[in-house]
Amino acid sequence: MKFLDQVKIYVRSGNGGAGAVSFRREKYIEYGGPDGGDGGRGGDVWIEAVEGLNTLIDYRYQQHFKAGTGVHGMGRNRHGAAGEDVVLKVPVGTEVLDEDKNLIVDMDEAGKRYLLAKGGNGGFGNTHFKGPVNQAPRHANPGLPGEERAIWLRLKLIADVGLVGLPNAGKSTFLAAASAAKPKIADYPFTTLAPNLGVVDLSVGERFVLADIPGLIEGAHEGAGIGTRFLGHIERTAVLIHLVDGTQEDIVGAWRTVRHELEAYGADLADKPEILALNKIDALDEETRAEKQAQLAEAAGMDVRLVSGFTGENVTELLREAFALVRERKRAAAEEAAGPSEGWTP
């Protein structure tokens, strides 16, 4: 299935049905009076987050959505039926923005629903206008028009851990080694053109979602290369795994480039817990491994792990470390949401 993470759509709720002008006509009843029913309410347009989706591709082929019009009222005080609602189903993690890209709602939980456009009310039938002066009103209200708006849908995948690095740093190979995902893998930059998700199963109770995004290059925050469009997919992650290609000459420069792009993008990406790893060590001898590990650790001011996505060397250990950080972050978030505990006093 093709990946699409941003699309503009147009929604319109249904118009309300018109009220009816009708009079009671029955045998032996000379002056039956008005009995026009009200029009039905126009249909609403809703958006709902559902599990099992990870792309907005369905909205590439249809961008206009209109709810049903309310049915007009009828005689004998029969009200019209309401128009049919439209429910737009989107992946969990989809943001809804107005035409100016201001956030309307974040569909961050499965089952969450939000009203995008409310249907117009139905018009009153002539029964409502009967009075002591006018006992046979010959007019009714038309239904109110529905609402119309243009909105943007922007998907930010929900993953626990994000993989970052320059193009060809071996992120897709690492994802394939860590999970059952089957991303496209080739020995050239920008092989990955869309985010990939994989579920990492370390053991019972040790499971998390790993996201691989297209590689960053210098100036990505200004739109260079693929730009930072896909960085939004790691905004929700708890931990970053930063892979540096150990076979290249300037490993420190590679690390600095990615760090700069994370800081320039904002959204606190640069402040997330980060595991720095030198990848492709299967192509290095022991002496070169140690030399490059020390060089990168000194520049970054943090420990550097040695891994090989190709052979799987040290991959499990790195994933367990990432899971421990994810668990710690989730525990801290839960405690913060619960608020300070009040001590019991007699």
Curated annotation (Swiss-Prot):
Protein name as catalogued: GTPase Obg
Gene Ontology biological process: ribosome biogenesis
Function: An essential GTPase which binds GTP, GDP and possibly (p)ppGpp with moderate affinity, with high nucleotide exchange rates and a fairly low GTP hydrolysis rate. Plays a role in control of the cell cycle, stress response, ribosome biogenesis and in those bacteria that undergo differentiation, in morphogenesis control.
Record-linked CDD domains: Obg (cd01898)
Top-level EC class as recorded in UniProt: hydrolase
Amino-acid positions noted as binding Mg(2+) in the UniProt annotation, renumbered to this chain: 172, 192
Annotated positions binding GTP: 165-172, 190-194, 212-215, 279-282, 308-310
Pfam families hit by this protein: GTP1_OBG (PF01018), MMR_HSR1 (PF01926)
Cofactor: Mg(2+)
Gene from which this protein is expressed: obg
OBG-type G domain residues: 159-327
Family: Belongs to the TRAFAC class OBG-HflX-like GTPase superfamily. OBG GTPase family.
Summary of subunit composition and partner proteins: Monomer.
Record flagged with keyword Metal-binding: yes
GO cellular component, one term: cytoplasm
Domain of life: Bacteria
EC number: 3.6.5.-
